[in-house]
Curated annotation (Swiss-Prot):
Regions crossing the membrane: none
NCBIfam families: hypA
The name this protein goes by in its record: Hydrogenase maturation factor HypA
One MF term in the entry's GO annotations: zinc ion binding
Organism: Francisella philomiragia subsp. philomiragia (strain ATCC 25017 / CCUG 19701 / FSC 153 / O#319-036)
Length: 112
């Protein structure tokens, strides 16, 4: 059910943009990192439910999957993450900065 509230947030952003353009939304692109904690299948399921009777009701949802990338604090090696508590494959350290892949954001909105 967490994904439904995320859909509502995305729709709220698009509604505000649509009000400024006085148009309906034909497509919305959302980038979701693999560490964002979003179940993409659930998000895709809930999107049309949340968009019903809004300027996004007919909008196509496009999701861009973003692979998480981290940089090791010990050896500065950059590597892909599939889960949060992964150690550096170069030196074995667990200390890292996550460079990308932990966020969810509206990448673009296309109006009719």
């Amino acid at each position: 059910m967490h994904e439904f509230s995320l859909c509502q947030s995305v729709i709220s952003i698009a509604k505000k943009a649509a009000e400024n353009n006085s148009k309906k939304v034909s497509k919305i692109v959302v980038k979701i990192g693999n560490l964002a904690g979003v179940d993409i299948e659930s998000f895709e399921f809930w999107f049309p439910v949340a968009a019903k009777d809004s300027v996004l009701e007919q909008a196509k949802l496009e999701i861009i999957h973003e692979q998480a990338i981290a940089k090791c604090k010990a050896c500065e090696h950059e590597f892909e993450l599939t889960r949060l508590y992964e150690q550096c494959p170069n030196c074995g350290s667990f200390e890292k900065d996550i460079l990308k892949g932990k966020d969810m954001l509206v990448e673009s909105i296309v109006f009719n």
